[in-house]
Each structure stands twice: as structure tokens, then as C-alpha cells.
Amino acid sequence: MKKIQSTCNLCALACNLDFYVENGKIEKVSPTVDYPVNQGFCCIKGLNLDKQQTKIKARKTPLLKDENGNMKEISWEEGFKTFAEKMTAIQEKYGKESVAFISTGQIPTEDMALLGHVGRNYMKINGDGNTRLCMATSVVAHKQSFGFDAPPYTLNDAELSDTIIFIGANPVIAHPVFWGRVRKNTTAKIITIDPRKSETAINSDIWVDIKPKADLV
């Protein structure tokens, strides 16, 4: 079995993993012991990367659920017609704002542009995306705080800081590798600002339980 070292692609922490490959298939995943980022540890998401190898063939025709809950193939013409009729009926009954779309960061730019064009100009609906709720906010925050749009700090700072503040973040669950580095700093005061009493809030020195939705301002 061949061992190949590579970087986990599931978050920006960039942990290093050892992939054990046989006959072109990943059979086992384990964290790289001496890598400086994750230091021999990784989260359950990285450990299960071998489960993401199933290739799903793209469908050539749409599927429509019948009255019994079974999926049947229909033509593209019927698919577009059915979608348009159903969406129009919903908007006529409940108003234009009853329908919205949210996009992902995992589709090509051209597809994203088409989705936005159809949504705004034809369906007259609101849309949002993963980008604005995720990295776009980080980019603006970094630029306003440090003068450029990338984080200037390193993981070592978590082990050396006097005070660490988490705002709406739950690294105990979302980024356990980073949280492990934080816990190595036994003298730091940890403050969590979050309307939820999250796992990170429970493990903090101070939990500031602000009003729900106030963290979106």
C-alpha cells in the first residue's frame, strides 16, 4: 500500500494527511505525525476523506417525483415547464419574497452568474451565497483591522496570546485542530461572544451571551 502525503481540502487550516492508496483508491487516512500545522492530529472530517471517492454520474435528464413519491425521468422541456409553473404559483400565492436562493462556493463562476441572472431578472427574487456569509466577511475584517485581506497571524499566536476572543465561532466542534492549539496556552483568558451556549462558550473563561441575531450586525 502506497503512502501519499497531501493537504486536507475541507477548510483553510490546511492540515497534512497521510493517504494510504491501493489500486488507485484511498483505503485509509491518518494525520501526518510531524507536520507543524496539525501536529499529528486532525478532525473527523479529514479522517473520512476516503469516504468521498464515490463517483456520481451526472444525470442527462431531470427527475420528477410522482404522487407515490417515486422519481421518474422527464424531458428537459417538461422539467423547465413544471419548475416555472410551480414557482410562479408559489409567488402568486405568497408574494415574490416567498422565494429566495442561496448559492455555494463549489460551482463555476459561469453557473453562478447564470443563477443570479435568472433569479434577479426573471424570477425577481433575492439571493445570497456562501461567499458573503463566509470568506467575504473575513476579507473585509482583515483589511479593516490589519490593512490587507489575509490573516497576518499564525497558529503559534494561539499558544502565545494573553487573551483570545471568539465571536460567533465554535472551534471546539468546527476546528478542533485549532482548538487544540488554543488549549496548549494554559495562561490565556478565553472569551466567547455568542448568543448560543456553544461547546466553545462552555470551555471559555468568559461567555458573553448577547441577544440572538445581534452577532449578525
What is each model feature region?
Residues 1-215:
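N-terminal export/assembly segments and adjacent metallocofactor-ligating motifs
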